Amino acid sequence: MKKLYLASNSKTRKQILDNVGLKYIVNPSNIEEISLKDDPREYCIDLSNQKAKAIAKTLKEGVILSADSVIYFEGKILEKSKTKEEAYENLKMLSGKVNIAVTGVTIIDLYQNKEITFYEETEVIFDDLTDEEINWYIENEMFIFERAGYSIAGKTAIYIPSIKGDYYNILGMPISKVYKELKKLGYQISDFE
């Protein structure tokens, strides 16, 4: 049996791995998340690489899985909203438009000395939102921990009529692609303890 280390403390990422039956050990990297990359794909890959490599330095063996996600909209990377005002501005900006959830993933296999890095993109289509709807959402949701101030798995779901791409990517872990990459390395879900 092999060990899989999740370089994240994200409840959502843990839930996704739990849902598919993937056994893992939580080992968050605790790095300061700084990237100088402007392109959202490069930005997410850079941060997922930093996290995975920080964990790899502390281990002799294992498979490390790391991810980083952002919302990309009209040439800007939108980070987690820190205030109600920031969440309001983000949701107002996204209203009636399409934004892109980008997740960079790094898998470092210390057993085979291999590394895989990829990104996934999903288009998220928002309904037109009234000020009343935005204010209701902000008062009734834990927006402060969410990229661009929203979570498709929460109350925002009522404002998102469709997506193009992987739903789980929006949540921060494109699990189908992760599984395909683990298979390329020769692993099955049941290989991890």
Q: Language model features by range: what are they?
A:
Residues 2-22:
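N-terminal beta1-alpha1 ligand-phosphate binding loop
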Residues 2-4, 26, 40-193:
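Anionic-ligand binding patches
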Residues 9, 29, 110:
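Cofactor-binding loop segments of dinucleotide-utilizing enzymes, especially the Rossmann-like FAD-
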Residues 25-33:
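A short beta-strand-loop structural module common to alpha/beta enzyme folds
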